[in-house]
């Protein structure tokens, strides 16, 4: 049992760390899912990764409540990206590389 409770600032910092950990878990689970051909394992790993995404939403909502201004900064960032996207011409958007093209793999993990 800890000797003291977290201060408000420490709690906010801890929640930010929790969000980072959830992102790391998603990366790890998705990497494992992409590295296997086993359908059940792939499905379970993707499901778990999606659960981590829900956790991120829960932690982000807590940050909004605790900080009182987190949503303002998130909204500002979204607006900046939307403005950049609007400024791109159709030709520029067409030239952008497509995601999910030819897959590069590490080869067999058995060999």
Residue ranges and their predicted role:
Residues 1-111:
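Iron-associated oxidoreductase/ferritin-like identity signal
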